[in-house]
Amino acid sequence: MRFTQQLFALAATATLATANSITFVNQDATQRTVYFTPSAGLQQIDSVVIAGNDQAKVDIPESWIGNAYSVSDGAANVPGMLAEFTFNGWGGLTYFDVSAIVNPNDLDGVKELYPASELTTQVKTLISGCTVFPCSTAYYHPDDVQTVTTLETDFICTLGNPTTEVAREVKTELVPRKFVLGKF
């Protein structure tokens, strides 16, 4: 009986250690809905409504590949800036970027994407996107070398326009798009 309990506890701990999440932080008073688009054949994630100046944490399935975008309350559901992810990809890495390819004119949606461990750091080294677009840390063209990698699996995604603007132009470690797609 005791062995079974220990085995169950170990399995639960392993599950927690490999959990993926994105915390969406709404930086202004506008309510937003975040929509998820999985790659073909992967699990759909329900959309989430985030009140103005609030946040919501969303659990992401193991090895999930896809994107998320936000739509401001009252606006048409049109994809804008995309938060793109490959969780637990090649080499156990999570690949991520903010993509302006679909709609570079979206100034109110996804802004920045970075590991949760960098939330309190002044200068973020693993970041994609920016507070004011255009910037050099967003993905603008197919095969752009703007994808960032990390072993971390918990992320922060900022939405909307912060009340204080801080420009972050930090050199980040980038990898070619083929690794994100698993095409070596």
Task: Please place each PLM-identified region on the residue numbering.
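Fungal secretory targeting signals
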Residues: 1-21, 180-184
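Extracellular low-complexity, O-glycosylation-prone Ser/Thr/Pro/Gly-rich "stalks"
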Residues: 22-48, 56-65, 70-184
